[in-house]
Amino acid sequence: MDFRLNDEQELFVDGVRELMASENWEAYFAQCDRESKYPERFVKALADMEIDNLLIPEEHGGLNAGFVTVAAIWMELGRLGAPTYVLYQLPGGFNTVLREGTQEQIDKIMAFRGTGKQMWNSAITEPGAGSDVGSLQTTYTRKNGKVYLNGSKCFITSSAYTPYIVVMSRDAASPDKPIFTEWFVDMSKPGIKVTKLEKLGLRMDSCCEITFDNVELEEKDMFGREGNGFNRVKEEFDHERFLVALTNYGTAMCAFEDAARYANQRVQFGETIGRFQLIQEKFAHMAIKLNSMRNMLYETAWKSDNGLITSGDAAMCKYFCANAAFEVVDSAMQVLGGVGIAGEHRIARFWRDLRVDRVSGGSDEMQILTLGRAVLKQYR
């Protein structure tokens, strides 16, 4: 595989470097993390570079650049300290609506292009249905030409401020044979209650519990086809897990470089700590993990661009990168010592963020189960 970037990709990566050097973004990110605030100004700056157009088809005014280009940009953003986890909806969110939505839904979401604002997300997880998605209890009921949504969702990302949520629910009229359908819900409707939850990490993107009490919808609010909810989100899960893995790599690379610079200037016992063999061992292991992550990510991106990605690929990528990246950040924190745990160094934020990613977007355990099944299926 040729790892050299083409001219278009180089332009994007150069643009990212210029943006990150244009001001002290770290101070802004630290403030947003403390205040659990979405970094809209930063995302708007990326939108001005057309980052939100990367995967949109050319017939809709997009760049159709592909996931290899997304990978190159996300890796560089992460390496330079950007919280790329707030960008998960940018590369794929528009495409999903273009593919599944009605024209009215498409118009509502495409109006957010170029704004940097949060626009929509999926609501799937419930108090009694996390990894066991088939146990969802939120229902939709048809009555007098209307559709009524009832139930609760929890740990829903971006839901504090997004104007629209796509809600997975089951048909109340079919209790014995579950029919799962998604609904495009305007969050300003009566009967919706949103409760913000505090998180250990990933604090720049909200996490909420949402309750729906007889929320009135129209048939036109259906998202995609009736009964196709699971099939639709399966593809979304695969791409989400790939993007989580990209974020993990970028964050780990940033921590690695911070620790390397520190090791080359911190003096103890009359010499820089980077000359100590135990410190060198840490960097050797970190470098091996980072190189392995990078290779896996580019391979997965290439597979996605060529229609070859499987759930097993996404699970492997997500599991390996989430764990390897956390180990890299943990080792980098050990190198930084007191600076990393008692000061205001960004490594503490990275450590919190990456620990969350071993649960969010699919737990470690579910990735292993998915991957194990996928591997054995190849030999039946």
From Swiss-Prot:
Its EC number is 1.3.8.13. Pfam families: Acyl-CoA_dh_1 (PF00441), Acyl-CoA_dh_M (PF02770), Acyl-CoA_dh_N (PF02771). GO terms for molecular function: acyl-CoA dehydrogenase activity; flavin adenine dinucleotide binding. Pathway: Amine and polyamine metabolism; carnitine metabolism. Coiled coil: none annotated. Its main location: cytoplasm. Gene3D superfamilies: Acyl-CoA dehydrogenase/oxidase, N-terminal domain, Butyryl-CoA Dehydrogenase, subunit A, domain 2, Butyryl-CoA Dehydrogenase, subunit A, domain 3. CDD domains: ACAD. It catalyses: 4-(trimethylamino)butanoyl-CoA + oxidized [electron-transfer flavoprotein] + H(+) = crotonobetainyl-CoA + reduced [electron-transfer flavoprotein]. Its cofactor is FAD. Belongs to the acyl-CoA dehydrogenase family. This is Crotonobetainyl-CoA reductase. The lineage of its organism: Bacteria, Pseudomonadati, Pseudomonadota, Gammaproteobacteria, Enterobacterales.
